[in-house]
Amino acid sequence: QYGDIRAALGRFQFSSDQVKSKLSQLSGGERARVALLKLLLEENNLLLMDEPTNHLDMDSKDTLEEALINYEGSLVTVSHDRWFLDQVVNRIWELQDGVITTYYGNYTDYVRAKKGLPPLADGEVSEV
Protein backbone atom coordinates (compact mmCIF):
# COMPACT_ATOMS: atom_id res chain seq x y z
CA GLN A 1 0.00 0.00 0.00
CA TYR A 2 2.94 2.36 0.68
CA GLY A 3 4.01 1.99 -2.96
CA ASP A 4 0.48 2.79 -4.14
CA ILE A 5 0.42 5.95 -2.04
CA ARG A 6 3.85 7.04 -3.32
CA ALA A 7 2.73 6.42 -6.91
CA ALA A 8 -0.45 8.43 -6.33
CA LEU A 9 1.56 11.29 -4.82
CA GLY A 10 3.78 11.21 -7.90
CA ARG A 11 0.74 11.42 -10.21
CA PHE A 12 -0.28 14.54 -8.27
CA GLN A 13 3.18 16.04 -8.98
CA PHE A 14 4.68 15.67 -5.50
CA SER A 15 8.46 15.40 -5.54
CA SER A 16 10.30 13.03 -3.20
CA ASP A 17 11.30 16.03 -1.06
CA GLN A 18 7.69 17.20 -0.79
CA VAL A 19 6.58 13.70 0.21
CA LYS A 20 8.89 13.94 3.22
CA SER A 21 7.66 17.44 4.19
CA LYS A 22 5.21 18.20 6.95
CA LEU A 23 1.78 19.22 5.73
CA SER A 24 2.21 22.63 7.38
CA GLN A 25 5.24 23.28 5.15
CA LEU A 26 3.27 22.81 1.92
CA SER A 27 1.64 25.65 0.00
CA GLY A 28 -2.12 26.10 -0.10
CA GLY A 29 -2.30 24.51 -3.54
CA GLU A 30 -0.17 21.56 -2.44
CA ARG A 31 -2.39 21.04 0.62
CA ALA A 32 -5.44 21.13 -1.67
CA ARG A 33 -3.85 18.40 -3.83
CA VAL A 34 -3.19 16.29 -0.71
CA ALA A 35 -6.84 16.68 0.37
CA LEU A 36 -8.09 15.67 -3.09
CA LEU A 37 -5.76 12.71 -3.23
CA LYS A 38 -6.88 11.57 0.24
CA LEU A 39 -10.51 11.66 -0.93
CA LEU A 40 -9.71 9.65 -4.04
CA LEU A 41 -7.76 7.01 -2.11
CA GLU A 42 -10.56 6.41 0.40
CA GLU A 43 -13.20 3.83 -0.44
CA ASN A 44 -16.04 6.26 -1.09
CA ASN A 45 -18.89 5.77 -3.51
CA LEU A 46 -19.90 9.44 -3.45
CA LEU A 47 -17.74 12.55 -3.65
CA LEU A 48 -19.13 16.02 -2.92
CA MET A 49 -16.71 18.62 -4.26
CA ASP A 50 -16.97 22.41 -4.12
CA GLU A 51 -14.72 24.14 -6.67
CA PRO A 52 -12.20 21.25 -6.75
CA THR A 53 -9.94 22.87 -9.35
CA ASN A 54 -9.32 26.04 -7.34
CA HIS A 55 -5.65 26.45 -6.35
CA LEU A 56 -4.53 23.73 -8.79
CA ASP A 57 -2.01 24.22 -11.58
CA MET A 58 -2.76 22.82 -15.05
CA ASP A 59 -0.93 19.53 -14.47
CA SER A 60 -2.80 18.97 -11.21
CA LYS A 61 -6.12 19.78 -12.90
CA ASP A 62 -5.34 17.24 -15.62
CA THR A 63 -4.46 14.64 -12.99
CA LEU A 64 -7.66 15.34 -11.04
CA GLU A 65 -9.76 15.12 -14.21
CA GLU A 66 -8.21 11.78 -15.13
CA ALA A 67 -8.75 10.44 -11.60
CA LEU A 68 -12.40 11.53 -11.59
CA ILE A 69 -13.05 10.14 -15.06
CA ASN A 70 -11.78 6.77 -13.79
CA TYR A 71 -13.60 7.08 -10.45
CA GLU A 72 -16.27 4.39 -10.17
CA GLY A 73 -18.53 6.21 -7.70
CA SER A 74 -20.76 9.24 -8.09
CA LEU A 75 -19.54 12.82 -8.11
CA VAL A 76 -21.57 15.88 -7.18
CA THR A 77 -19.60 19.05 -7.82
CA VAL A 78 -20.02 22.80 -7.95
CA SER A 79 -17.55 24.46 -10.29
CA HIS A 80 -17.10 27.55 -12.43
CA ASP A 81 -14.40 25.71 -14.41
CA ARG A 82 -16.20 24.98 -17.69
CA TRP A 83 -13.37 22.88 -19.11
CA PHE A 84 -13.34 20.71 -15.98
CA LEU A 85 -17.12 20.24 -16.18
CA ASP A 86 -16.88 19.29 -19.85
CA GLN A 87 -14.35 16.60 -18.97
CA VAL A 88 -15.91 14.97 -15.91
CA VAL A 89 -19.70 15.42 -15.80
CA ASN A 90 -22.44 13.59 -17.67
CA ARG A 91 -25.40 15.30 -16.04
CA ILE A 92 -26.11 18.83 -14.81
CA TRP A 93 -28.76 19.81 -12.30
CA GLU A 94 -29.90 23.39 -12.59
CA LEU A 95 -31.72 24.90 -9.61
CA GLN A 96 -33.78 27.92 -10.57
CA ASP A 97 -36.75 29.40 -8.70
CA GLY A 98 -36.97 26.32 -6.47
CA VAL A 99 -37.17 23.91 -9.42
CA ILE A 100 -34.46 21.39 -10.35
CA THR A 101 -34.07 20.66 -14.06
CA THR A 102 -31.82 17.82 -15.23
CA TYR A 103 -29.71 18.17 -18.36
CA TYR A 104 -27.88 15.10 -19.69
CA GLY A 105 -24.39 15.50 -21.06
CA ASN A 106 -21.49 17.76 -20.19
CA TYR A 107 -21.36 21.54 -19.73
CA THR A 108 -21.27 22.25 -23.48
CA ASP A 109 -24.37 20.07 -23.96
CA TYR A 110 -26.08 22.01 -21.16
CA VAL A 111 -25.30 25.39 -22.77
CA ARG A 112 -26.51 24.13 -26.14
CA ALA A 113 -29.74 22.79 -24.61
CA LYS A 114 -30.37 26.15 -22.91
CA LYS A 115 -30.05 27.79 -26.35
CA GLY A 116 -32.36 25.22 -27.94
CA LEU A 117 -29.54 23.59 -29.92
CA PRO A 118 -29.06 19.81 -30.33
CA PRO A 119 -26.15 18.02 -28.61
CA LEU A 120 -22.88 17.82 -30.51
CA ALA A 121 -22.02 14.70 -32.48
CA ASP A 122 -18.87 12.86 -31.36
CA GLY A 123 -15.81 14.78 -32.54
CA GLU A 124 -17.77 17.93 -33.39
CA VAL A 125 -16.39 21.18 -31.94
CA SER A 126 -18.70 23.70 -30.29
CA GLU A 127 -18.71 27.37 -31.15
CA VAL A 128 -21.07 28.14 -28.22
Model-identified regions with their sequence ranges:
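ABC ATP-binding cassette signature C-motif
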Residues: 1-128
